[in-house]
């Protein structure tokens, strides 16, 4: 029974990846607005109905790692080693994200399309909320605590600044050193 579940989950992951890869290739090649979801489904050899079982919208095809990114942010806080601060754990996580930053071509695609920019903004707001909730839980603060929300917002905003810098690792170290000196838990 376990093998069947494993195979089924593996097949679902392969289908999801095939859809996301086909979509990105077509969007980069021809432009987001010029590609329909039927073309993406055909390129991945699935039906449009199947496409929408995996992705709720055309925009979601571009952000196929949305849930993974959020889960990793929360895990960075909850799964940090004993004795490591939340800020230090987030610094390490943001550095890992920076090292696997999206390509310039991908970023241009997002910036060129209002629907994708809006989706990305809403996605990062969801991640910010989840991260703030995780920080609050770890700090013993009530959900919605403004300092936890501010830390989450600052950390996620810093990601963009770090990726845009010519020396991302150095930029991250400087930003998080400032944060570490200034942000204290009470």
Q: Language-model segments: which ranges?
A:
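Hydrophobic/aromatic residues within well-ordered alpha-helical segments
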Residues: 15, 65, 69, 86, ...
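Amphipathic C-terminal alpha-helical segment
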Residues: 122-123, 152-170, 181-186
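A secondary-structure capping/hinge motif
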Residues: 59-61, 111
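C-terminal peripheral helix-coil segments that are non-catalytic and often amphipathic
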Residues: 2, 133, 137, 168-186
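Basic, helix-initiating cap at the start of DNA-binding domains
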Residues: 1-30, 34-46, 63, 72
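Hydrophobic alpha-helical connector segments
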Residues: 71-108
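Short hydrophobic/aromatic patch on the recognition helix
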Residues: 46-55
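Amphipathic alpha-helical packing segments from all-alpha helical-bundle domains
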Residues: 114-139, 145-153
């Amino acid at each position: 029974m376990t093998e069947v579940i494993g195979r089924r989950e593996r097949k679902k992951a392969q289908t999801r990846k095939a859809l996301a890869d086909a979509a990105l290739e077509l969007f980069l090649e021809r432009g987001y607005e010029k590609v329909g979801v039927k073309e993406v489904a055909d390129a991945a050899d699935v039906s449009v109905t199947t496409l929408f079982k995996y992705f709720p919208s055309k925009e979601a095809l571009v952000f196929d790692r949305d849930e993974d990114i959020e889960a990793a942010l929360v895990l960075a806080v909850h799964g940090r080693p004993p004795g490591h601060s939340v800020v230090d754990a987030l610094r390490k996580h943001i550095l890992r994200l920076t090292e696997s930053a999206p390509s310039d071509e991908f970023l241009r695609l997002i910036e060129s399309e209002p629907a994708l920019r809006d989706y990305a903004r809403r996605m990062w707001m969801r991640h910010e909320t989840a991260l703030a909730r995780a920080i609050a839980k770890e700090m013993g603060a009530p959900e919605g605590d403004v300092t936890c929300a501010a830390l989450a917002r600052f950390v996620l905003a810093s990601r963009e600044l770090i990726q845009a810098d010519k020396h991302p690792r150095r930029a991250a170290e400087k930003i998080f050193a400032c944060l570490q000196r200034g942000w204290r838990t009470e």
